[in-house]
UniProtKB/Swiss-Prot annotation:
Annotated region (Flexible loop), positions in chain: 100-110
GO BP annotation list: one-carbon metabolic process; S-adenosylmethionine biosynthetic process
Binding locations of K(+): E44
Keyword Cytoplasm set for record: yes
UniProt similarity note: Belongs to the AdoMet synthase family.
Designated name of the protein: S-adenosylmethionine synthase
Lineage, uppermost ranks: Bacteria, Bacillati, Bacillota, Bacilli, Lactobacillales
SUBUNIT field: Homotetramer; dimer of dimers.
Gene that encodes the chain: metK
Originating organism: Streptococcus gordonii (strain Challis / ATCC 35105 / BCRC 15272 / CH1 / DL1 / V288)
Residues that hold Mg(2+) according to the record: D18
Pathway: Amino-acid biosynthesis; S-adenosyl-L-methionine biosynthesis; S-adenosyl-L-methionine from L-methionine: step 1/1
Entry binding sites for L-methionine: E57, Q100, D251, K282
Function noted in UniProt: Catalyzes the formation of S-adenosylmethionine (AdoMet) from methionine and ATP. The overall synthetic reaction is composed of two sequential steps, AdoMet formation and the subsequent tripolyphosphate hydrolysis which occurs prior to release of AdoMet from the enzyme.
Amino acid sequence: MSERKLFTSESVSEGHPDKIADQISDAILDAVLSQDPDAHVAAETAVYTGSVHVFGEISTTAYVDINRVVRDTIAEIGYTNTEYGFSAETVGVHPSLVEQSPDIAQGVNEALEVRGNADQDPLDLIGAGDQGLMFGFAVDETPELMPLPISLSHKLVRRLAELRKSGEISYLRPDAKSQVTVEYDENDHPVRVDTVVISTQHDPEATNEEIHRDVIEKVIKAVIPAQYLDDKTKFFINPTGRFVIGGPQGDSGLTGRKIIVDTYGGYARHGGGAFSGKDATKVDRSASYAARYIAKNIVAAGLAKKAEVQLAYAIGVAQPVSVRIDTFGTGIVAESKLQEAVRQIFDLRPAGIIQMLDLKRPIYRQTAAYGHMGRTDIDLPWEKTDKVQALKEHLA
């Protein structure tokens, strides 16, 4: 009998407390970048019942009305009713942002490679904003080259938000979570969905029966291809029996607490650094995007069915200290040759990544819910496959 394996990933909606915090942090980043593309930003947010605290470091010439950005973001998510215990108009906003440390700025603004060197490459000017390791991943399980469990999990909570905002399911409230368990065959190909868990906040009048019916018919069956569902697929819809109190009234939220949701749902490794609220000189963010860009182009080029890319940096140094590629035995060329090609084709210095992916633009708020990778609903530069031909030619 062939061996079957299960793998599970989860996602959360834009109304989840941690995701509210991520979206506020990225909305502040976008507001700053729209005026000052060269700003350095590290904006953290904490949310809880009736209160939002924004803190961190910013170096910029821009003026941003933090209070307005916070309230507008909360309203766009859907927290406009005081019954939710957290409302855009009544929430208390407490900003506490200071200037970036000059010790850090020294290494970011002038990388080790150019200090005391008159003959300098402009792209060597920016050093990494911190040490660290970052991962990117791609696999041919879905058209967007993402693992199927996280792809479906994101689509489920995004569908809930669409139905809530359109009014088609009027009793839905903003907070929600999804979880999908996929069964794989002995060749690591997804064959069916074993279990779907959805917890969605709702008005008190909604019955469990109508929630169960609507979620299965209008969410699960609308999102998950019929080929993956069978009579053995298990559905757990609001398994606690009631989910009226939610959002920051139910749990506090912090920026950067959903890093696995933001990436590959646990299917690939993670370096530990969060994304939201950070400008692109922070390699936690920009190098993770670059690593995804590399991995996706490798798989799109047919050079491997699965690819994981690790990049690592030293603070204040432009060039990565290491580049590693793992194709898990699915590659058609040696990994050493892939690594050589990647170093030739992709500029992995922070300034090179920023230029390559055009990361000084205010594009980040849209990434702060429903995943930073594999998005098909928005246009993100690290999701392009425009290096496929260059990789093929280099390795020919």
